[in-house]
Amino acid sequence: MIIKGKIWKFKDNIDTDQIIPARYLNTSDPLELASHVMEDSEKPNFAKEHQEGDIIVAGKNFGSGSSREHAPIAIKYAGVPVVVAKSFARIFFRNAINIGLPIVECKEAVDEAEDGDIFEIDLENGIVKNVTKNKTYSSTKFPEELMAILRAGGLMEYAKSRLSS
């Protein structure tokens, strides 16, 4: 599973209220959530300016705060195929995997990244390449069980496929 795209770099401690502000939690429409993704972050125009396939790159503790699936859903339905960060809040990590949003921990890649760089991420082998800077980094590699969930598109789809086989 190879993912390639332009990055948008965010700071440390992006919490779920910055990813999807609480004022939008009265909807469960994923496309409506996506239209407000990152609205309360340091890049409030992200939802309007990013292109499908662009990648979010952030510092440590991405997704901290309230436990809500709305945050990874907003990111996924905005067309962001992966989030790369120095570290993730544990509940965000689990929610992201459950809805089929790949997340990758790679401190060195984040430290050296700049807005607009092109990343190529090999999830299967735990490799992040900054194509712009021609640098390659080792990232945390997913166990096969989590890769199977991601390949299926999330935990529900994975469970359905297991039950039907």
Swiss-Prot record:
It catalyses: (2R,3S)-3-isopropylmalate = (2S)-2-isopropylmalate. Keywords: Amino-acid biosynthesis, Branched-chain amino acid biosynthesis, Leucine biosynthesis, Lyase. Its EC number is 4.2.1.33. Disulfide bonds: none annotated. Pathway: Amino-acid biosynthesis; L-leucine biosynthesis; L-leucine from 3-methyl-2-oxobutanoate: step 2/4. It is an enzyme of class 4 (lyase). Transmembrane segments: none annotated. Catalyzes the isomerization between 2-isopropylmalate and 3-isopropylmalate, via the formation of 2-isopropylmaleate. HAMAP family: LeuD_type2. Heterodimer of LeuC and LeuD. Belongs to the LeuD family. LeuD type 2 subfamily. PANTHER family: 3-ISOPROPYLMALATE DEHYDRATASE SMALL SUBUNIT 1, 3-ISOPROPYLMALATE DEHYDRATASE SMALL SUBUNIT 2-RELATED-RELATED. This is 3-isopropylmalate dehydratase small subunit. The lineage of its organism: Bacteria, Pseudomonadati, Aquificota, Aquificia, Aquificales. The gene is leuD.
